[in-house]
Swiss-Prot record:
InterPro entries: APOBEC/CMP_deaminase_Zn-bd, CMP_dCMP_dom, Cyt/Deoxycyt_deaminase, Cyt_deam_tetra, Cytidine_deaminase-like. GO terms for cellular component: cytosol. The active site is at E67. Zn(2+) binds at C65, C99, C102. Belongs to the cytidine and deoxycytidylate deaminase family. It catalyses: cytidine + H2O + H(+) = uridine + NH4(+); 2'-deoxycytidine + H2O + H(+) = 2'-deoxyuridine + NH4(+). This is Cytidine deaminase. One of its GO terms (biological process) is cellular response to external biotic stimulus. It comes from Mus musculus (Mouse).
Length: 146
């Protein structure tokens, strides 16, 4: 069954670059505890791609997910307008999905951008941030109490 593309649809050539970049980023994952490598690739409004991988720590709460690594890299270089992110893992039977913390961090930068959740065979599903985190809390909500 054909899947509807979100309104934030990304050009096919950008999607392919994102998917490849997320798979490449996964190779750099530092995950000695979970042995669950994840890679992410983030597409900015002007077409630049920032990649990231998960980085674990012996003090488990200090680890960081691939999605947040990519977003933090982009922010640290002055980018805040995002069009899409692709996420890769070694899960064979399911599409990799961002955790709740990553969904909230993505939400900080808008609700109508694409999240490509992949499998190693290259297949993917795409959802918007809004679809992954409905009824969310964002920066504009802070203005409602002033």
């Amino acid at each position: 069954m054909a899947q509807e593309r979100p309104s934030c649809a990304v050009e096919p050539e950008h999607v392919q670059r994102l998917l490849l970049s997320s798979r490449e980023a996964k190779k750099s994952a530092y995950c000695p505890y979970s042995r669950f490598p994840v890679g992410a690739a983030l597409l900015t409004g002007d077409g630049r791609i920032f990649s990231g991988c998960n980085i674990e720590n012996a003090c488990y709460p200090l680890g960081v997910c691939a999605e947040r690594t990519a977003i933090q890299k982009a922010i640290s270089e002055g980018y805040k307008d995002f069009r899409a992110i692709a996420i890769s893992s070694d899960l064979q039977e399911e599409f990799i999905s961002p955790c709740g913390a990553c969904r909230q961090v993505m939400r900080e930068f808008g609700t109508d951008w694409a999240v490509y959740m992949t499998k190693p065979d290259g297949t993917f599903v795409v959802r918007t941030v809004q679809e992954l985190l409905p009824a969310s809390f964002g920066p504009e909500d802070l203005q409602k109490i002033q």
